């Protein structure tokens, strides 16, 4: 009986071992783990379709997409939860605060680009990181400048949608 239990521990196909955490790429020297979460096809699909890892995008396009998303979602908490939330100027205050935060984040990205960041390494979730992005100071600076443009654009879009919500609802019923 004990031999059967010991033998089953070494079989990845044994149903009792399906949710066991394995070393990444079955190599314990890498210092990374392959878990049911980060090795699942859904996680891999989601992460690999984010702008940072999607193949074939220039650093400027990546920065624009990431900036648009961040500017859009940063606007909401500032406008609806900020200190001016119950005033007529809440949306304008949210827009200005979101733009201010995007400018600060762009400065942080620029500082990071000047620190000579390491290249992306393959991992369980992203086995083939894009080689054309984030590999030089210039690509990081292109990403940061496009992030600024996209972030301001995303905040402005969110501002116009929120400020004109009554008109938009009237158009669509």
From Swiss-Prot:
Transmembrane segments: 92-112, 148-168
Pfam families xrefs: PsaL
Membrane association type: Multi-pass membrane protein
Subcellular locations according to the entry: Cellular thylakoid membrane
Leader peptide range in chain numbering: none
GO biological process: one example: photosynthesis
A cellular component annotation (GO) from this entry: photosystem I reaction center
Alphabetized UniProt keyword annotations: Membrane, Photosynthesis, Photosystem I, Thylakoid, Transmembrane, Transmembrane helix
Domain of life assignment: Bacteria
InterPro entries for this protein: PSI_PsaL (IPR003757), PSI_PsaL_sf (IPR036592), PSI_suXI (IPR022980)
Family per record: Belongs to the PsaL family.
Protein name: Photosystem I reaction center subunit XI
Protein source organism: Nostoc punctiforme (strain ATCC 29133 / PCC 73102)
Lineage, top ranks: Bacteria, Bacillati, Cyanobacteriota, Cyanophyceae, Nostocales
């Amino acid at each position: 009986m004990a031999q059967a239990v010991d033998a089953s521990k070494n079989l990845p196909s044994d149903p009792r071992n399906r949710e066991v955490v394995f070393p990444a790429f079955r190599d314990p020297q890498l210092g990374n783990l392959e878990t049911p979460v980060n090795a699942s096809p859904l996680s891999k699909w989601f992460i690999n379709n984010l702008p940072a890892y999607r193949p074939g995008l220039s650093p400027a396009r990546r920065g624009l997409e990431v900036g648009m998303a961040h500017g859009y979602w940063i606007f909401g908490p500032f406008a609806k939860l900020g200190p001016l939330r119950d005033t007529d100027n809440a949306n304008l205050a949210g827009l200005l605060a979101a733009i201010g935060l995007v400018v600060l984040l762009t400065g942080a990205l620029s500082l990071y680009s000047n620190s000579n960041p390491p290249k992306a390494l393959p991992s369980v979730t992203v086995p083939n990181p894009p080689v054309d992005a984030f590999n030089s100071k210039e690509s990081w600076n292109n990403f940061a400048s496009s992030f600024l443009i996209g972030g301001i654009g995303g905040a402005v879009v969110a501002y116009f949608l929120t400020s004109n919500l009554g008109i938009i609802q009237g158009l669509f019923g």
